[in-house]
């Protein structure tokens, strides 16, 4: 063989060995276990148990239980339960010595019956039910009253406060404004009146000055351009 063929065959040899080893293991196991399964149909108790390595010389033996060798179930005390369930008020149970013992009857109801309540009504004191309408009024907590603040020249109107009943308190203005758009501040009213007078006088002065200037210019025009008078001269008759 050539060197190229040898190089191609050498990597395949380990894979072939692994395949041969894997395929040979299950065949050996099946050959050893097949006679036992054919003879009995199930693993016998007398045959030696196999270990994981496939050898039969294992000193330890595992006991396999079959449905035929199931241990009997312990008997449950059903009779005692039936006797306890059948026991009621006034019923008798058999004791250990063959005698029948009576159970103590259950006590009466925890709550009194309606008949007992009706019988005890005359003996009980009558307690009036509380009326929500006639409940005593709670004392109102007094709030500290602060003195009114001094109203400045540009102060806004005081805020309304709520009474204890939930109604707003209408503040009483200390000063009635001159116009509706003014606030309740006397200093603001004075400032408004003074500014109105100053603006009125300034407009009057401006109007008077404009009239005086316009009248002077008209008079000067007349002096520089006097009016021409036409006079009828007598005709000369020769």
Curated annotation (Swiss-Prot):
Residues 28-42, 49-68 have a biased composition (Polar residues). GO terms for biological process: symbiont-mediated suppression of host chemokine signal transduction pathway. Residues 25-189 are virion surface. Residues 211-238 are intravirion. Residues 78-88 have a biased composition (Acidic residues). Residues 1-24 form the signal peptide. Residues 89-100 have a biased composition (Basic and acidic residues). Residues 28-171 are annotated as: Disordered. Disulfide bonds: none annotated. Belongs to the alphaherpesvirinae glycoprotein G family. It is a single-pass type I membrane protein. This is Envelope glycoprotein G. Keywords: Glycoprotein, Membrane, Signal, Transmembrane, Transmembrane helix, Viral envelope protein, Virion. Its main location: virion. It is found in: Virion membrane. Glycans are attached at residues 28, 49. The chain crosses the membrane at residues 190-210.
């Amino acid at each position: 063989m050539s060197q190229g063929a040898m190089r191609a065959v050498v990597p395949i040899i380990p894979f072939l060995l692994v395949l041969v080893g894997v395929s040979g293991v299950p065949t050996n196991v099946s050959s050893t276990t097949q006679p036992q399964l054919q003879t009995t149909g199930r693993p016998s108790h007398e045959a030696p148990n196999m270990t994981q390595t496939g050898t039969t010389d294992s000193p330890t033996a595992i006991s396999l239980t079959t449905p035929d060798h199931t241990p009997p179930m312990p008997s449950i005390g059903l009779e005692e339960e039936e006797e306890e369930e059948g026991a009621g008020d006034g019923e008798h149970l058999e004791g250990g010595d063959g005698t029948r013992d009576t159970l103590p009857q259950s006590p009466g109801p925890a709550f009194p019956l309606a008949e007992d309540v009706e019988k005890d009504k005359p003996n009980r004191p009558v307690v009036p039910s509380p009326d929500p309408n006639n409940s005593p009024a709670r004392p109102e907590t007094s709030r500290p009253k602060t003195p009114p603040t001094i109203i400045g020249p540009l102060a806004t109107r005081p805020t309304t406060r709520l009474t204890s009943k939930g109604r707003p308190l209408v503040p009483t203005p200390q000063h009635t404004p001159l116009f509706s758009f003014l606030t309740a501040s006397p200093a603001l009213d004075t400032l408004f009146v003074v500014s109105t007078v100053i603006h009125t006088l300034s407009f009057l002065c401006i109007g008077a000055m404009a009239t005086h200037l316009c009248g002077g210019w008209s008079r000067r025009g007349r002096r520089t351009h006097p009016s021409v008078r036409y006079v009828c001269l007598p005709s000369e008759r020769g």
